Amino acid sequence: MRHSLPASIVHALLLAAALAVGTPAHAQTDALPSWNDGPAKQAIVAFVKDTTEQGSAKFVPPEERIATFDQDGTLWVEKPMYSQVMYCFDRVGALAEKKPELKNVEPFKTVLSGNREAIAKLGMRDLEKILAATLTGMSVDEFQAQVTKWLESAKAPRYDRPYTELTYQPMQEVLSYLRANGYKTYIVTGGGQDFVRVYSERVYGIPPEQVVGSAGGTKYGYDKSGKPFLTKEPKLLLNDDHAGKPEGIHLMIGRRPHAAFGNSAGDQQMLEYTKAGDGARLAMLVLHDDATREYAYGPAQGLPDSKVGTFPQALYDEAKKQGWTVISMKDDWKRIFAWE
């Protein structure tokens, strides 16, 4: 026995099906559920809609859809110290086991002491010595294995969680949202390119070839069996910070981004470079103003000053002047981490 549905229900089902078919990814569901509905979220949604809808005056061809993201402080926690620096400090202990004489040599002696106040007072030359000793002198494969092993056990002191669990859920949603709408996402970081490439695909869905960072030289050679390998050398090829970011983008990507995201003075030139292009451009800065859920630092807007991820008032003023969007962690993000 056949039963017919009421005409009103049939009409509703047909309408729903018609709306679902061919609907752009940005219009089907809320792709940014961890964002409060405010100017920042609206700016992202409007940008994606304007640049991906056929017939839009601001339409961007798929091959030109490039979005760049700083990592530390933009995609994951950078306090109390950059994760790569924490890795280097931890590696000093392993080095001292192989070379006991380092226990009496500065700055390694200070790091091994565990005295946080003394470590915080180390100068740039001291840090350079530590970075050179822990990031170079081994093969690329050995370095990748060391970083992978460290990430398996290292935890951020405040949260007692692995660093890879301290990515910002709202920014993860932006990455996915952009990719769903044809954007290619890149990490452009002042941190070590080889370091970030170890985990970028697993943590952010960004393959290693789409990571641009501060890069050191390598030397080609052969092991005892004749197998070729690369050795990391203490020679800086690219300082991917401040003006180095647009230089790195040109060198490694070859296209000017249509969207750029950062959080500090080191990202200013990347945002300037992005906005200077023709057509629709999106420039956004994350402001850390939530001491309860994460950290609060600036010193923009009267927030505490910080040597890590400095966001000066001059950058805040420039953002307002240039029409960049400042993302307030406190006001714009419903939650910060996926595990909240």
Feature map (PLM): residue ranges:
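Bacterial N-terminal signal peptides that target proteins for export
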Residues: 1-13
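Non-catalytic pre-domain segments flanking phosphatase-related domains
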Residues: 3, 19, 26-71, 86, ...
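Short catalytic/ligand-binding loop motif for oxyanion handling, primarily in non-cytosolic enzymes
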Residues: 77, 84-85, 195-196
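Short, solvent-exposed loop/turn elements at domain surfaces
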Residues: 53-55, 76-78, 220-221
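Asp-based phosphoryl-transfer active-site loop
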Residues: 65-80, 271
